[in-house]
Curated annotation (Swiss-Prot):
SMART domains: Ribosomal_S10 (SM01403)
Gene designation: rpsJ
Source superkingdom: Bacteria
Protein name: Small ribosomal subunit protein uS10
Classification lineage: Bacteria, Bacillati, Cyanobacteriota, Cyanophyceae, Nostocales
Complex formation: Part of the 30S ribosomal subunit.
Family, similarity comment: Belongs to the universal ribosomal protein uS10 family.
Gene Ontology molecular function terms on file: structural constituent of ribosome; tRNA binding
Organism expressing this protein natively: Nostoc sp. (strain PCC 7120 / SAG 25.82 / UTEX 2576)
Membrane-spanning segments: none
Length: 105
């Protein structure tokens, strides 16, 4: 039995600001739906927390420390049956600079 391989675009988004990430996901899904492609997502992935421990004093006091953290929020969007219109619309889409985008065909 031969099965047809479905064409798929996987878009992976990362950002430090969750609200900025969600608005970017909405723009991508709306663009895909306008060009008659099927968009599944955004699928939230686990948030990565990176904690930095810094001494508060420039001197010897090792008891006084301060913690800082960065949170990286991630989402995945799958677009099935993309046409050339879909790819052109996604290329022309204006997204904020705080969002890291990775596209796989």
């Amino acid at each position: 039995m031969a099965t047809l391989q479905q064409q798929k675009i996987r878009i992976r988004l990362q950002a430090f600001d969750r609200r900025l990430l969600d608005t970017s996901c909405e723009k991508i899904v709306d663009t895909a739906n306008r060009t008659n492609a099927t968009a599944i997502g955004p699928i939230p992935l686990p948030t990565k927390r990176k904690i930095y421990c810094v001494l508060r004093s420039p001197h010897v006091d090792k008891d006084s420390r301060e913690h800082f953290e960065t949170r990286t929020h991630r989402r995945i969007i799958d677009i099935y049956q993309p046409s050339s219109k879909t790819i052109d619309a996604l290329m022309k889409l204006d997204l904020p600079s705080g969002v890291d985008i990775e596209v796989k065909l």
